[in-house]
Amino acid sequence: MKLGFDNEKYLREQSEEIRRRAGRFGKLYLEFGGKLMNDFHAARCLPGYDPNVKLRLLQTLKDQAEVILCIYAGDIERKKMRADFGISYDADAMKLIDDLRNLGLLVRGVVITRYQEQPAVQQFRAKLERRGVRVYYHYKTAGYPADVDTIVSDIGYGKNEYVKTEHPIVVVTAPGPGSGKFATCLAQIYHEYRQGNVAGYSKFESFPVWNLPLDHPLNIAYEAATIDLKDKNMIDPYHLEAYGVSTVNYNRDVDAFPLLVAIWQKMTKGSCPYKSPTDMGVNRIGFGIIDDEVVRNASRQEVIRRFLRYQCLFAEGSTDRDSVERAKQLMDSLGLRTEDRVVVEAARRAAEEAQIAGKGKAGGTIVSGAAIQLQDGRIVTGKNSDEMHAAAAAVLNAVKTLSGIPSKIPLIGPYIIQAVSHMKQDILKVGYTSLNLDEALIGLAISSATNPAAQIAMEKLSELRGCEVHMTHMVTPGDQAGLRRLGCRYTSDPYYATNALFNGEQ
């Protein structure tokens, strides 16, 4: 893989900038936008980027910093999921606390934002508090966004519980976007000034990249990733007016800036230290780019992946047509087609060939194809059958290719497949027998105990991490679980494999 990003250069630049900004205030509330860890969007767009580089950054600051974690009450109530891990935001919040503690970072507490006495939220608070985690409620801000006098008052920010902190840098982060980090920072600063303390605010957000062009594929990829939030990149008009320099920001920050200035002046009874939304930021990610063309190409691929994902979400009823159309507009702006993702055509061709040959499942009435692009660029395909899903077949064919094992040699013994099929159909009565990818991986592990070829192939599974995968039909939960464990970047066409509304298939 060609690298487009230098983590060490970025870490040096970023830590210096945060320390410099913290030096301007007695205490700095630093809003960490995006994902604090496992930032796979950045890793996909910036080849070479460490998905956990922000944790490494915090480790360099751990003697000066502590963490407040925010989570929106509505996300807890509706069990919002992280698509890349398949876990809920509340579970991710607990995982994040564990990970931060394991790195020696102090987690001061969890702030539940826009709390409305939801039972699920109360249960979540009780669970955390019984495990020794401090939890605070913040409420919908009275008067927001028009009435600054009410916002900056005891019934506005003053109504929120104050989180007592000790370190000069307070990192305010969250499992995902829309969690109330900005409001939490301002509420904390309100309480600081009420107590006679001086505190400041800055924003650390990787995207959009302020010092890259508005139409750079990396910035467009960010917009594609946040379509559900209705984010749009734009030139920062305040920065242009103040400095005569064109920088990129996004609509929410630009729209909120006049309000921030008014709130800041009301809270501190002084002038705002920032002349633009760009001024507020401390992002140095653009300075870590070492090969612009590599980053451009990777970002173009991310835009295609996002479009394919929104098509599937629409088919599931999880998003609206506007989101699909917006994703298509972004793809068109870069002159892209879905076929520019090479595994797309390969998967479709595999399905077509299977259909012509009368292969597939249920006598050829259900035909699916899958394709994997290996790290060396080779494409390996798989087709579904009565024995296994297309994703499972493609993965097994991929590890055969990597191991130099002839295609005719079976990796999972027929007796294992037959035993699993018997259990599923005759004992568990699940109504289907073919192995999904997750089941096939277990079958491969069992076979490896007696089959040397399976043992060799199993050792190659780690080489599939980061490989591109496409399937011609919507991915089942069992295939998703396997692909996530392997670390593959997968997409699919927005079609169900059958017309059945429910078939129990995993």
Where are these regions (language model features)?
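Flexible phosphate-sensing "switch/lid" loops adjacent to ATP/NTP-binding sites
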Residues: M1-V171, Q188-A354, G358, I366-V367, ...
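Residues at the beta-strand->loop junction immediately N-terminal to the Walker
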Residues: T173-P175
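Short strand->helix junction
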Residues: P177-S179
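Hydrophobic positions on the alpha1 helix immediately C-terminal to the Walker A/P-loop
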Residues: T184
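Short clusters of small/polar residues that mark proteolytic maturation junctions
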Residues: K383-N384
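A short, polar/charged loop-to-alpha-helix boundary motif
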Residues: E387-S403
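Short HxH-centered metal-ligating active-site micro-motif
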Residues: T401-T433
